[in-house]
């Protein structure tokens, strides 16, 4: 199964350590993570990619992915776009937010009631991984 892991890139990257652990956990479980770059310390644009190249690559990866896992504890226009893009294609989205940041997550995201969307609060990354284990497509909770 191909996972699009989404996380803030240009804004507040306070959850980066959690994103790195999520990436590692997904790969250890045999998932193909298409967006390993979200866990990089150096941004793609700092490596020379143009915004257009980033957009085109990410759209291609969104189309290829089976499920989107988004870290939404800190605001990101890009992650919001990716979530909407995926949802409108009827694909499953799991949004993860640190419990202490849940009220800071966009009301638009917190208000999604579509069947292919789950917002999951977590206290630490181990809890997030445990919840992901039960929620990824194929499990009872996302069907």
UniProtKB/Swiss-Prot annotation:
InterPro entries with a match to the protein in the record = 2'-dNMP_N-hydrolase, DNPH1, Nucleoside_deoxyribTrfase
E.C. designation(s): 3.2.2.-
Keyword terms of this UniProt record: Glycosidase, Hydrolase, Nucleotide metabolism
Gene Ontology terms: biological process: deoxyribonucleoside monophosphate catabolic process; nucleoside metabolic process; nucleotide metabolic process
Which reaction equations make up its catalytic activity?
a pyrimidine 2'-deoxyribonucleoside 5'-phosphate + H2O = a pyrimidine nucleobase + 2-deoxy-D-ribose 5-phosphate; a purine 2'-deoxyribonucleoside 5'-phosphate + H2O = a purine nucleobase + 2-deoxy-D-ribose 5-phosphate
The record's SUPFAM superfamilies line, in alphabetical order, gives: N-(deoxy)ribosyltransferase-like (SSF52309)
Task: Report the domain of life of the source organism.
Answer: Archaea
Q: Which Pfam families does the entry mention?
A: Nuc_deoxyrib_tr
Q: Which GO MF term does the entry hold, naming one?
A: 5-hydroxymethyl-dUMP N-hydrolase activity
Q: Which residues bind substrate?
A: 37, 82, 106-108
For the keyword Hydrolase, the answer is: yes
How this chain assembles, per its entry, is: Monomer and homodimer.
Please report which protein family the annotation says this sequence is part of. Answer: Belongs to the 2'-deoxynucleoside 5'-phosphate N-hydrolase 1 family.
Q: What does this protein do?
A: Catalyzes the cleavage of the N-glycosidic bond of deoxyribonucleoside 5'-monophosphates to yield deoxyribose 5-phosphate and a purine or pyrimidine base.
Q: What is this protein called?
A: Putative 2'-deoxynucleoside 5'-phosphate N-hydrolase 1
Please report the organism this UniProt entry assigns to the protein: Thermofilum pendens (strain DSM 2475 / Hrk 5)
């Amino acid at each position: 199964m191909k996972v699009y892991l989404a996380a803030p890139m240009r804004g507040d990257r306070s959850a980066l350590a959690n994103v790195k652990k999520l990436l590692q956990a997904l790969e250890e479980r045999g998932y193909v993570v298409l967006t390993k770059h979200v866990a990089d310390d150096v941004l793609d644009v700092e490596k020379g990619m143009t915004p257009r190249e980033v957009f085109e690559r990410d759209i291609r990866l969104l189309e290829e992915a089976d499920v989107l896992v988004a870290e939404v504890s800190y605001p990101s226009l890009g992650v919001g776009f990716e979530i909407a893009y995926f949802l409108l294609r009827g694909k499953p989205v799991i949004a993860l937010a640190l419990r202490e940041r849940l009220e800071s997550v966009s009301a638009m995201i917190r208000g999604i009631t579509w069947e292919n969307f789950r917002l999951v609060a977590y206290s630490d990354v181990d809890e997030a991984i445990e919840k992901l284990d039960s929620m990824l497509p194929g499990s009872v909770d996302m069907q």
